[in-house]
A protein has these predicted regions:
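Short coil/turn segments at secondary-structure boundaries
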Residues: 5, 44-48, 100-102
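Active-site-proximal segment of RNA-dependent polymerases
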Residues: 24-70, 74, 114, 118-125
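Conserved polymerase palm-domain catalytic core
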Residues: 60-127
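Charge-biased, low-complexity intrinsically disordered regions
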Residues: 1-33, 37, 59-66, 80-85, ...
Length: 127
């Protein structure tokens, strides 16, 4: 259901991409849309948020004495299926257990959120 390949990062290292096949990708796109209707981002959130970008985020930090910029290693892969199920079952989402499990299974590859799936950005923001 997934094809894995490597891409180069700016620092010269590689990143593993796990791309879903066409059928699963279409399902995930629709699911990502439904999840986006449920998710209300915090004002401070900028990653993967419509009409927000790196320029807008950076403008919040103009004239600051210090700025910390970090890149979390394997960020999506740190989110496992159990966290997704738990998040969906609790407030504010309150999704039933069976539905939460099904959604989580559709969003995960080998029990984790893959880099390359259409659902990964919204799931990471919801978590």
């Amino acid at each position: 259901m997934y094809t894995q390949f490597m891409i180069s990062k700016k620092n010269g290292k590689s990143r593993i991409i796990s791309a879903p096949n066409k059928k699963l990708r279409n399902i995930q796109r629709k699911l990502a849309y439904v999840l986006s209707l449920m998710y209300k981002p915090k004002v401070c959130a900028y990653g993967f948020i419509d009409k927000k970008d790196i320029i807008g985020n950076a403008s919040n930090h103009l004239r600051k004495k210090e700025i910390l910029n970090i890149d979390l290693k394997d960020f999506f892969y740190q989110i496992h299926i159990g966290r997704i199920i738990g998040m969906l079952e609790k407030k504010p989402y309150c999704v039933g257990h069976e539905a939460a499990v099904t959604i989580a299974q559709l969003c995960c590859y080998n029990g984790k959120v893959p880099q390359g799936a259409p659902t990964s950005p919204i799931i990471s923001n919801m978590i």
